[in-house]
Regions:
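Core RecA-like ATPase module of SF1/SF2 helicases and allied nucleic-acid translocases
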Residues: 2-190
Length: 190
């Protein structure tokens, strides 16, 4: 679904063109199939415990730490094609430099999947719903999607798709072994 016409990759490319169009004053670099541009919204797509970040704290020494984590969202502030690095300013004011090979850790974030949005809230959400596998088109997924919106929610899709999701209460049974694990630890489960 991510690769479909209304999938995350295509929508990100289209939204990038509209919201952050190419400009002679904005540096760009390509990594794989993704074109990154200064001003782009990006998301960290895996935990990196080693990447160093800094945060300017006015009136105090700069903070420094390690670790940018899956789901952190920010904006590309600078692309240096000579030294081959990209600077991202995250929404919590941490700034991190990525060398070009590290760009595999970030992706455009104009559009993100419902799965990637879990745990986040946004002032405005545009939810694009299309038909998909029943295991992905569930009431719980729809609930997760609509509760990401703090103030405004716009749903693009068919009412039939929404109705099917509301009626689809099936969840795949999980065989995690949790009960066995807790029993082995001596935990009594009633």
């Amino acid at each position: 679904m991510k690769n479909d016409k209304l999938g995350v990759y295509n929508l990100n490319s289209r939204l990038q063109d509209m919201l952050n169009p190419a400009d002679d004053d904005k540096a760009e670099c390509r990594f794989g199939d993704t074109l990154f541009r200064e001003g782009d919204r990006v998301m960290q797509n895996k935990n990196d415990y080693d990447i160093i970040w800094t945060r300017k704290v006015y009136g105090k020494p700069d903070e420094e730490g390690e670790g940018i984590f899956n789901g952190d969202i920010g904006t590309i502030m600078h692309i240096d094609n000579i030294s081959k690095y990209v600077t991202v300013l995250f929404d919590d004011e941490r700034s991190a430099d990525y060398n070009f090979p590290q760009l595999e850790e970030i992706e455009l974030a104009y559009c993100i999947s419902i799965h990637k949005s879990q745990g986040s809230e946004f002032p405005c959400v545009v939810l694009v719903l299309m038909n998909g596998p029943m295991m992905l088109m569930t009431r719980n997924i729809l609930y997760t999607a609509v509760t990401r919106a703090r103030s405004n929610l716009f749903i693009i899709g068919s009412s039939g798709c929404i109705e099917r999701m509301v009626r689809n209460t099936r969840e795949k049974r999980r065989y995690s072994g949790l009960l066995h694990f807790l029993t082995e630890l001596g935990t009594e489960i009633s």
